[in-house]
């Protein structure tokens, strides 16, 4: 190969943000509605309503004045014209590429854990071997990839509602690539005929023949995985650490060196449909599995690849997905497509696919020392976030309903607010992710659960718990109703934050011709955009746990779910704020138990 070829991450035909690539990838063949725009008068009125409980009266009055000035300004008209023009594309959304560029490609730390998100799946495959599970999963994922290539898997229905699966178009054969002057999202929409397998930091290429049945492919893959697992060859963490550097410039330098020495190998990694990691460890708890997927002493990763399977020696699965393209709801949907189809196959008479080892440049002693330091730096970065796992079998959705509580999410967030106020005497903004896939390229919006009613209840409760709980039935219905209404608004594209983000980005990209609105500098604007408590809930029978770092330096991250079996959560906080989370968890548990015990 001519090493003077332009690297794929610098080619416009591989750049997700190139309008031609976007148009080629995303075709709204199911006529799913586009993400709606709203008049600024509408979303800014909602902004004032949602932000009022979060700021002082003085700051709120200033925000009201700033909103009025903005609505009367030339800048407002210019910004809305830009958004309206972006909304004309029926095969995208006015926000989608902005979201990719500014929410993810501007990540300043390692792509994992900042962008790569791990999801633990509990599978009905007890007793399976690592090779059996890897083969079944890979065959099913390969089949889904083929369907995506043929545009046979573009949407799904739930209770007569159609949801988009557009994110599948950019999750295969893709990768986020760190560059000092701005990250690139590489995607190859030409059909790939191979996957990459990693075991003990040795990379293997498996070319797949589509001529046989899915069962035949699974048998071939199983024999191939057995061969790879039987191979004792191992390498210390090496060039793959370029995906885990703590600076973009360092990652770019290593990537450029690697491209100059072995471009063929690099292209194999990027162009592969997906990666399968065969980990030589046995882990049991969700938290252990999630943390292992991000950092392990043997590393064994190529972070920021679109989608990866991480399978342990005791056949436990974590899906590592690049959040730039794929969020938790999409992972849950993907799991529900393939998990029910998992079954063992008879390998008698089958032939293994021949694994081809990918050849990395030789690592001399100086480079080994350098990579060892990179590994330490990455470990320090990852473990600066401390995580805890909660699993409460005594706190379930049926129990809540039996207490007369209709909306479990509203109740949980009220308890979060009480715990927060008891911990630091503050009521801060909370991010709650809301699925917007009923729109083409809709992704997520967020709701802000604090309201005047919830704030008043929290303060009453913290002052007089017994007296306040005696009047719980008087206060709670309004809190619950508002939470439900905010959720409904966010689901239909009528939230607050995405519209505010769009207005800001329209100005940001045209600030040479648009004066910066004073509204963007108000305390209220900055407060509604902050996420000291960042939360996300995915309730699914297979996707049981996931994790993410705090969004704010002094904040906490809460990945949780409640269903008929339990309440479970992975909570995160940075080391310097550890005591805050410990106190918060204690107060949260006490609050839930006290309220449930009191309610009859």
Curated annotation (Swiss-Prot):
- Binding of CoA occurs at 396-409
Q: Where is the active site?
A: 323 (proton acceptor)
EC number(s) reported in the record? 2.3.1.-
Keywords for this entry? Acyltransferase, Transferase
Q: Which Pfam families does the UniProt record give? A: Carn_acyltransf
Which EC class is the enzyme in?
transferase
A GO molecular-function term, please?
acyltransferase activity
Identify the stretch annotated as signal peptide in this record.
none
Keyword Transferase on entry: yes
Q: Which family does it belong to?
A: Belongs to the carnitine/choline acetyltransferase family.
Q: Which PANTHER family match?
A: CARNITINE O-ACYLTRANSFERASE
Put simply, this protein is called Putative acetyltransferase MPN_114
User: Whose protein is this, by species?
Assistant: Mycoplasma pneumoniae (strain ATCC 29342 / M129 / Subtype 1)
């Amino acid at each position: 190969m001519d090493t003077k070829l332009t690297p794929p991450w610098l080619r416009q035909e591989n750049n997700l943000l190139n309008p031609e690539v976007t148009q080629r990838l995303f075709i709204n063949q199911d006529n799913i509605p586009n993400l709606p725009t709203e008049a600024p008068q509408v979303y800014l009125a909602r902004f004032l309503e949602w932000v009022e409980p979060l700021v002082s009266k003085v700051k709120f009055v200033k925000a009201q004045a700033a909103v009025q000035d903005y609505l009367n300004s030339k800048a407002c008209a210019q910004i809305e014209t830009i958004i309206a023009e972006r909304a004309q594309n029926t095969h995208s959304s006015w926000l989608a590429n902005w979201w990719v560029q500014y929410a993810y490609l501007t990540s300043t730390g390692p792509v994992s854990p900042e962008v790569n998100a791990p999801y633990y799946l509990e599978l009905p495959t007890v007793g399976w071997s690592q090779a059996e599970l890897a083969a079944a999963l890979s065959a099913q994922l390969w089949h889904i990839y083929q369907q995506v290539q043929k545009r046979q898997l573009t949407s799904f229905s739930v209770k007569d509602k159609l949801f988009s699966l557009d994110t599948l178009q950019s999750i295969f054969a893709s990768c986020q690539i760190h560059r000092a002057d701005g990250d690139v999202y590489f995607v190859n929409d030409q059909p790939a005929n191979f996957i990459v397998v990693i075991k003990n930091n040795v990379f293997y290429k498996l070319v797949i023949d589509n001529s046989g049945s899915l069962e035949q492919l699974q048998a071939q893959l199983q024999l191939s995985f057995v061969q790879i697992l039987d191979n004792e060859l191992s390498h210390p963490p090496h060039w793959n650490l370029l995906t885990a550097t703590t600076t973009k410039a360092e990652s770019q330098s290593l990537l450029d060196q690697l491209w100059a020495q072995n471009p063929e190998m690099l292209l194999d990694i990027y162009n592969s449909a997906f990666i399968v990691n065969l980990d030589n460890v046995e882990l049991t708890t969700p938290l252990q599995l999630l943390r292992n997927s991000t950092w392990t002493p043997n590393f064994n990763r190529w972070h920021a690849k679109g989608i990866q399977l991480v399978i342990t020696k005791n056949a436990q699965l974590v899906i590592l997905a690049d959040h730039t393209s794929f969020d938790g709801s999409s992972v849950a949907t993907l799991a529900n497509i393939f998990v029910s189809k998992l079954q063992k196959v008879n390998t008698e008479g089958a032939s293994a696919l021949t694994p081809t080892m990918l050849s990395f440049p030789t690592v001399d002693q100086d480079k080994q020392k350098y990579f060892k330091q990179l590994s330490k730096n990455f470990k320090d970065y990852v473990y600066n976030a401390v995580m805890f796992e909660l699993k409460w079998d005594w706190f379930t959705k049926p129990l809540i309903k039996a207490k007369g509580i209709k909306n479990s999410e509203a109740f949980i967030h009220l308890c979060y607010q009480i715990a927060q106020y008891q911990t630091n005497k503050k009521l801060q903004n909370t991010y709650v992710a809301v699925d917007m896939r009923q729109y083409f390229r809709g992704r997520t919006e967020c709701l802000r659960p604090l309201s005047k009613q919830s704030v008043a209840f929290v303060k009453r409760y913290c002052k007089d718990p017994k007296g306040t709980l005696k009047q719980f039935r008087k206060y709670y219905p309004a809190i619950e109703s508002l939470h439900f209404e905010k959720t409904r608004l966010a689901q239909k594209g009528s939230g607050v934050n995405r519209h505010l983000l769009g207005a800001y980005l329209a100005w940001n990209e045209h600030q040479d011709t648009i004066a910066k609105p004073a509204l963007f500098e108000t305390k209220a604007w900055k407060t509604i955009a902050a996420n000291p408590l960042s939360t996300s809930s995915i309730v699914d029978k297979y996707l049981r746990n996931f994790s993410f770092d705090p969004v704010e330096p002094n904040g906490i991250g809460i990945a949780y779910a409640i269903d008929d079996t339990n309440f479970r959560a992975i909570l995160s906080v940075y080391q310097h704020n550890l005591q805050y989370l410990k106190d918060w968890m204690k107060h949260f548990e006490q609050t839930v138990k006290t309220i449930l015990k009191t309610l009859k």
